[in-house]
Amino acid sequence: MEASDPTSNGHRSVLGRWVLVLAGWTCLAIDPAAAETQEIRWEILAEGLAITLWEPGDRCEDEVPSSVILKADPGRVRFATYHFRDEGLAEPPAVRDWQRRTGASVMVNSGLFLEDYSYLGILLKEGRSIGGKRHPIWQGLFVAEPVQPDLRKAGILDLSVDHFSLERPAYREAAQSLMLLDRKGKLRVRRSGRQAHQTVVGENGDGTILLIKTTAAVGLRELAECLRVGLPELRQAMALDGGSSSDLLLAPDLLGKFEGEREPAPWQEFVDGSGQRHIPLPSVIGVFPRSEEGK
């Protein structure tokens, strides 16, 4: 029998099929959707602060709207909680009034509250309670400004596994709310069918803090799923208050550097106080530059 010519048409067609298969594997390996996960383009606001308008798109089956994400480095900024009664005020201010009063670079709503404006859960300021009792079900606790210098400067505690003593708190600032996504990647909210504007605080694997505000209504479960898929660097996340209380505001001096540009930044209308009606907020979290001493 005559030996086969390896360059014959039959062998060339087999070789061609293998080339196509390998090319397909290569395409899968550099799937654009995976590559999108994520080329986030951050705009620097100040030392330790950056911002972007994140577009989840078809990564989240178009169920989740674009969201403003503010990234904060706890080594360069500090966090402080506020409640209007602790400030000696008769009525809760709106977010812009909170910013003017405190001088914060960034102001964001905190967790949920009752009809009498009492905070629902743990709320600490400078190590003392300015909120209610520990909520028995909600397991998310945003903490900042540790008592001991060897602790991280800010982060999220999962109260289902992390210890936190109210008698001897390890952090001076704390706000309790609903856990969304834990450090094992487990979703901690159920699908409810209810939608609202949402505010989320997240913690990346490198310790940076994310403040996330959706630009439209979305369910918490859908948002949690989207964050897990679209932001793989996100280690854990918890929901703050939502609906009409969802608010994120930048100080005028941070926005001033973008004045005079031909077009406003795509995120600007959502954080300059012009894009929505602002209701009074009993409690807020402020972000401030950290002193040179790092205190």
Describe the residue ranges of each PLM region.
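Zymogen propeptides
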Residues: 34-135, 150, 212-213
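Short, solvent-exposed aromatic-acidic interface loops
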Residues: 84-87, 157-164, 214-217
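Catalytic metal-binding/acid-base residues of hydrolase active sites
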Residues: 112-113, 243-245
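Active-site neighborhood of phospho(di)ester-bond hydrolases with catalytic His/Asp-centered motifs
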Residues: 107-109, 237-240
